[in-house]
Amino acid sequence: MKAGNFSDTPEFFLLGLSGDPELQPILFMLFLSMYLATMLGNLLIILAVNSDSHLHTPMYFLLSILSLVDICFTSTTMPKMLVNIQAQAQSINYTGCLTQICFVLVFVGLENGILVMMAYDRFVAICHPLRYNVIMNPKLCGLLLLLSFIVSVLDALLHTLMVLQLTFCIDLEIPHFFCELAHILKLACSDVLINNILVYLVTSLLGVVPLSGIIFSYTRIVSSVMKIPSAGGKYKAFSICGSHLIVVSLFYGTGFGVYLSSGATHSSRKGAIASVMYTVVTPMLNPLIYSLRNKDMLKALRKLISRIPSFH
C-alpha cells in the first residue's frame, strides 16, 4: 500500500469464500438453506420451551435464550453475505463493518456466558440435587444473564471504539464474508499495538476463564456420577450433560480454530471456512443437538407442530 494513501471513511471489500462466478448461485442456495434452517430450528426451540409448562425450568430457559442469541448472531453476518452473493457485490461501508464487529462480539460474549451458566446448572442439578430449586432460582438466572450481557456489551464497545481511532488505507480487502476484528486490525495503517494487546488480554480473560469454569463444573460432575452405584443412574446423569458437552466442544473448538487460522495460516480460504463453522454451522446444529437426545424437548416439539393446521 502506498504511504499517505489514507481514508477517514473507508469502504471494505468482503472477498467471501470464492471469487468464481459459477459457484455463486450454489453458494447462495447453500447458505440461504443453512440460514433458514438455523432460524427455523432455533425458533422452534424457543416456541417449544415457552408453550410447554413442563419445560419452564432454568435449564430450558437458558436453552431458549441460547437459541435467541444464535438467531441474532447468525443474522448479524448472513443477510449481508447473501445480499452480496446475489448482487455479485463485495463492498461494505465503514459503518456497516463496525456494526458487524460490535454485534458479533456482543453475541459471542453472550453465548459464552450462557454456556457457562448451563454448565453451572448441570453441576447444581447433579452434585446438589436437593438444593437445586433454591440455588437456581429465577432471580439468580436473571442476574447472571444481565451480568453476561453487560460484560459482552462493554467488551464490544471497547474494541469498536478502539477501531474508531484507527486510520485505514484505501482498497481494503477482507478475506472473509463478514468484518472480523482480527482482519480489520491487519488492514489499519496506524499503530495497532494497543488494539492487539487488548484483543489478547480480553480473549484470555473472557475465553479461558469461562472455559476453566466449565471444565471445573464437569470435573465435579464426573466425580459425583462415578459414585452412583447403578449403571442406569450413571447413564442417565451423563446423558443429561451429553448435549451440552457437544455444544461446548463445537463452540470453543471452532472458536479456537478461527483464532489459530487467523494467526498461523497463510491461506485466507482456510480461515474463511473456519469462520463458517463458527458463525453458521454451530448455530444451525445447536437445536438438533439439544432436541434429538432429549425426550422432553422432542415431546414438546411434537405438541407444538401438531397445533399447526397444515400438520393435522
Curated annotation (Swiss-Prot):
It is a multi-pass membrane protein. Pfam families: 7tm_4. It comes from the Eukaryota. The chain crosses the membrane at residues 26-46, 55-75, 100-120, 140-160, 198-217, 238-258, 272-292. One of its GO terms (molecular function) is G protein-coupled receptor activity. Residues 47-54, 121-139, 218-237, 293-312 are cytoplasmic. Glycans are attached at N5, N93. GO terms for cellular component: plasma membrane. Keywords: Cell membrane, Disulfide bond, G-protein coupled receptor, Glycoprotein, Membrane, Olfaction, Receptor, Sensory transduction, Transducer, Transmembrane, Transmembrane helix. Odorant receptor. Belongs to the G-protein coupled receptor 1 family. This is Olfactory receptor 7G3.
